[in-house]
Curated annotation (Swiss-Prot):
This is Large ribosomal subunit protein uL14. It comes from the Bacteria. One of its GO terms (molecular function) is large ribosomal subunit rRNA binding. The keyword RNA-binding applies. GO terms for cellular component: cytosolic large ribosomal subunit. PANTHER family: 50S/60S RIBOSOMAL PROTEIN L14/L23 (PTHR11761), LARGE RIBOSOMAL SUBUNIT PROTEIN UL14M (PTHR11761:SF3). The keyword Transport does not apply. Belongs to the universal ribosomal protein uL14 family. Transmembrane segments: none annotated. The lineage of its organism: Bacteria, Bacillati, Mycoplasmatota, Mollicutes, Acholeplasmatales. It comes from Aster yellows witches'-broom phytoplasma (strain AYWB). InterPro entries: Ribosomal_uL14 (IPR000218), Ribosomal_uL14_bac-type (IPR005745), Ribosomal_uL14_CS (IPR019972), Ribosomal_uL14_sf (IPR036853). Part of the 50S ribosomal subunit. Forms a cluster with proteins L3 and L19. In the 70S ribosome, L14 and L19 interact and together make contacts with the 16S rRNA in bridges B5 and B8.
Length: 120
């Protein structure tokens, strides 16, 4: 379960390696997020176009908790990962590393699905 103060891996080539969740968008009482939700993060390690201590928005693309599909199956991953976003909700990087779920295209992130190496 991803909540505030959770550390996540970055799944794009924006330059950041690890981020820390400092906020959850979508209401004041939300305590945890799932795949496809937008969070506010700060960069903890990495170099490149984004620097340490930058505050950005990100979308969750993989979780250890997993995602339940309508047919009853679950998809779980080995890590919790995000893709960093600009203020207008476009992605910063040009490549997406690792698998993502196809449900992201239903949540208006079809660019992430098209750039991903593997779509489950």
């Amino acid at each position: 379960m991803i909540q505030r103060e959770s550390r996540l891996v970055v799944a794009d080539n924006s330059g950041a390696k690890e981020v820390l969740v400092i906020g959850i968008l979508g209401g004041t009482r939300r305590s945890h997020v799932n795949i496809g939700d937008i969070v506010v993060v700060t960069v903890k390690s990495g170099s490149g176009t984004v620097k340490k201590h930058d505050v950005l928005k990100a979308v969750i693309v993989r979780t250890k908790k997993g995602l339940r599909r309508k047919n009853g199956s679950y998809i779980k991953f080995d890590d919790n990962a995000v893709v960093l976003l600009k203020e207008d909700l476009n992605i910063i990087g040009t490549r997406i590393f690792g698998p993502v779920v196809r449900e992201l295209s239903d949540k208006k992130f079809s660019k992430i699905v098209s750039l991903a190496q593997l779509v489950l």
